[in-house]
Curated annotation (Swiss-Prot):
Transit peptide recorded as keyword: yes
GO process terms (BP): mitochondrial translation; translation
Region described as Disordered: spans on this chain: 60-86, 110-145
Subcellular location: Mitochondrion
InterPro entries linked to this entry: Ribosomal_mL52 (IPR034596)
Protein family: Belongs to the mitochondrion-specific ribosomal protein mL52 family.
Listed Basic and acidic residues bias regions: 117-132
GO cellular component, one term: mitochondrial large ribosomal subunit
Short name of one Pfam family: MRPL52
The protein, known as: Large ribosomal subunit protein mL52
PANTHER family according to UniProt: 39S RIBOSOMAL PROTEIN L52, MITOCHONDRIAL, LARGE RIBOSOMAL SUBUNIT PROTEIN ML52
Length: 145
C-alpha cells in the first residue's frame, strides 16, 4: 500500500487520506446547507481554572504589574501619562472600594440597631416580670410563731 507524504516525518495511507477527504467534504456540505449545529456555550480559556484556584486573575492581562505599570517613562524620570485602560481600571477599583465601605457601614449600623433592639426586648421582658401581679401567699413569707 503506497504511503502519501503529509508533513515532515508523517506519511498517511491512501485509505486514511480518502477518509479525511470525505469528512472534509461532508463538513463543507453541511456548512453550506446551514444544518450544522452551532455551540453557544461559554469557552473556558486554557489555564483559567488553574489561575482562579490559586487566587490569580482569570487571564494574565486582567491585573498585575504587566498590566498596571507603564511600559515607559520620560528620560528625566517623570512618569508616563496613564492610559485609558489604566484610568478605567482605577475608576472601577475606586467604585468597588466605595461600595465595600458603604456596605460595611450599613452592616455595622444594622448590627448596632439589632443590639439595641435586643436590649430593648430584654428591658421590656424585665419590666413585664416586675409589673406582674404577685400572689398574696408567697412561699418566701416567714411566719412568726
Amino acid at each position: 500500500m503506497p504511503l502519501l507524504y503529509c508533513c515532515p516525518g508523517f506519511y498517511l495511507s491512501s485509505s486514511v487520506t480518502r477518509l479525511l477527504c470525505v469528512r472534509l467534504r461532508n463538513s463543507v456540505d453541511l456548512s453550506r446547507t446551514g444544518n450544522r449545529s452551532v455551540h453557544s456555550s461559554t469557552l473556558r480559556c486554557a489555564g483559567q481554572d488553574w489561575r482562579v484556584r490559586r487566587g490569580f486573575a482569570r487571564s494574565g492581562s486582567e491585573y498585575g504589574p504587566l498590566t498596571d505599570l507603564p511600559d515607559w517613562s520620560f528620560a528625566d524620570g517623570r512618569p508616563a501619562p496613564p492610559w485609558k485602560g489604566q484610568i478605567r481600571r482605577k475608576e472601577e477599583r475606586e467604585a468597588l472600594a466605595r461600595r465595600v465601605v458603604l456596605l460595611s457601614t450599613e452592616m455595622d449600623q444594622g448590627m448596632t440597631n439589632w443590639h439595641k433592639k435586643q436590649q430593648e426586648m430584654k428591658a421590656e421582658q424585665l419590666q413585664k416580670e416586675i409589673s406582674k401581679l404577685k400572689s398574696k401567699a408567697s412561699p418566701n413569707k416567714t411566719t412568726n410563731t
